[in-house]
Structure formats: C-alpha cells, structure tokens
C-alpha cells in the first residue's frame, strides 16, 4: 500500500456517516411545502425562490463553469443509468448547492485526501456538497503522559 493510499485510509477512519433514508420513505418529504415531484418539475427560477438567502443569492448570480460541468456529468450519468450502466461521479466542487435533479445519485466528493461517497436524498436539497464530506478527522487522543499532547506535557513521568 502506497503512502497516499495509507493517508486515504487514515482519512476515512473516524467519519460520522449519516443515516441513509431509503427511497421508499421519500414520499413523506416536503421542502417548503413542495413534494419532490413538484420540485423536479419546477423551473429553476421558482426553485431559487424557495432556497435560503445565501443559496438563493449564489444561484441568482449564475453557476460557475465547474458547477455547470458537474451538472452536465450528472445529466449524462442519469442517461447512462437509465440504460443500466453504473456510473461514478467524482467532483472537487464542495461549494455546489444540491439541486432536486441530483436526488438519488451517489456523488463522490473530494475532502482533501480522498473521495467520500455522498448519497443524495431529498433532505439534502439546498445544502452544499461539502457539508457531507468533512475535511477533518475526529481526533482521538491517547493516554495522558509523555508525548501525548502539548497540554499533558506537565504530567510527571513515573
């Protein structure tokens, strides 16, 4: 195993994985009073009005070129998945806002070390992709004593 792969494995340890709600239970989903089907059929201008202010302002300014490229990848992947092919979508666009057309896909989001698979459910709509692929690990400190942490340097050695 190379050092880069070892780093990637270290990066995956300690991650909190959110519970995935199965698609059968998506019928109860509502976003600002709208069902998923209504959101999918809604024009982008109307959908933008439903978002919180930060996301609304970001989308009103228009998508960045890398976000447009990601949306093209997503649309292409959906076409291929309809034909029965398996497609992996990888991206570095952590600041992409999750749109209704992304629901049901697994997008691999880069966290600085490795790609973290994020299954997009309806409850993710309006959030950023980066919110679901944390960039830092949960720190698990060792026993207090010598060489543990800087704050425990003053514990007397036995």
Swiss-Prot record:
Query: Which InterPro entries does the protein's record reference?
Result: Ribosomal_uS19, Ribosomal_uS19_CS, Ribosomal_uS19_euk/arc, Ribosomal_uS19_SF
Q: Which GO terms describe its molecular function?
A: rRNA binding; structural constituent of ribosome
Q: Which PROSITE patterns match?
A: RIBOSOMAL_S19
Q: Which UniProt keywords apply?
A: Ribonucleoprotein, Ribosomal protein, RNA-binding, rRNA-binding
Task: Quote the cellular component terms of the Gene Ontology held in the record.
Answer: cytosolic small ribosomal subunit
Q: Does the keyword Ribosomal protein apply?
A: yes
On the tree of life, the source organism's domain of life is Archaea
Q: A single GO BP annotation from the record? A: translation
Q: Does the keyword RNA-binding apply?
A: yes
**What family is this?**
Belongs to the universal ribosomal protein uS19 family.
Q: Which PANTHER family match?
A: RIBOSOMAL PROTEIN S19P FAMILY MEMBER (PTHR11880), SMALL RIBOSOMAL SUBUNIT PROTEIN US19 (PTHR11880:SF2)
Give the protein's function. Protein S19 forms a complex with S13 that binds strongly to the 16S ribosomal RNA.
Give the protein's recorded name: Small ribosomal subunit protein uS19
């Amino acid at each position: 195993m190379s050092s880069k792969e070892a780093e990637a494995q270290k990066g995956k340890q300690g991650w909190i994985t959110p519970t995935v709600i199965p698609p059968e239970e998506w019928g109860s989903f509502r976003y600002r009073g709208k069902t998923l089907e209504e959101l999918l059929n809604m024009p982008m201008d109307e959908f933008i009005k439903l978002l919180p202010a930060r996301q609304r302002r970001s989308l009103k300014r228009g998508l960045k070129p890398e976000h447009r490229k990601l949306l093209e990848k997503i649309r292409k992947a959906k076409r291929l998945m309809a034909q029965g092919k398996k497609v992996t979508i990888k991206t570095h666009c952590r600041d992409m806002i999750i749109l209704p057309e992304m629901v049901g896909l697994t997008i691999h989001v880069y966290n600085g070390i490795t790609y973290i698979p994020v299954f997009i459910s309806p409850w993710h709509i309006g959030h950023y992709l980066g919110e679901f692929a944390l960039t830092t690990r949960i720190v698990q400190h060792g026993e207090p004593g010598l060489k543990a942490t800087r704050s425990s340097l003053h514990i007397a050695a036995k």
